[in-house]
Amino acid sequence: MSSRLAVFAYDIRDDRVRRHALKTLREWRLDGQLSVHECQVDAIQARRLFEQLGDELDPATDAWLFTWVEGHRAVLARGKGRTTALQDGLLLAA
């Protein structure tokens, strides 16, 4: 099974759970910020990560997002930033 680029993002209220999510995703990520992480994973790894971290969240207060990055899909953006397609599925967001 081949690995693909994926994005994991979260909004977690509890500091302990948030720190654990950050520590876990830093082991997998290629790049990212505090709550948004680009990771190179296969489908099994993605499912395990999503379920592992999702089990710790409080659905009443927290949010957890996973998506595959698909180069052939349109990119939607909203707000002050801008996006520019560079080449071969690369995207510049500023």
UniProtKB/Swiss-Prot annotation:
Disulfide bonds: none
EC number: 3.1.-.-
Binding site for Mg(2+): D11
Pfam families listed in its UniProt record: CRISPR_Cas2 (PF09827)
Biological processes per GO annotation: defense response to virus; maintenance of CRISPR repeat elements
Top-rank taxon: Bacteria
Signal peptide, first to last residue: none
GO MF annotations, alphabetized: metal ion binding; RNA endonuclease activity
Named cofactor requirement(s): Mg(2+)
Keywords: Antiviral defense, Endonuclease, Hydrolase, Magnesium, Metal-binding, Nuclease, Plasmid
Family of the protein in this entry: Belongs to the CRISPR-associated endoribonuclease Cas2 protein family.
Assembly with partners or alone: Homodimer, forms a heterotetramer with a Cas1 homodimer.
General function of this protein: CRISPR (clustered regularly interspaced short palindromic repeat), is an adaptive immune system that provides protection against mobile genetic elements (viruses, transposable elements and conjugative plasmids). CRISPR clusters contain sequences complementary to antecedent mobile elements and target invading nucleic acids. CRISPR clusters are transcribed and processed into CRISPR RNA (crRNA). Functions as a ssRNA-specific endoribonuclease. Involved in the integration of spacer DNA into the CRISPR cassette.
Protein name (database record): CRISPR-associated endoribonuclease Cas2
Natural source organism: Allochromatium vinosum (strain ATCC 17899 / DSM 180 / NBRC 103801 / NCIMB 10441 / D) (Chromatium vinosum)
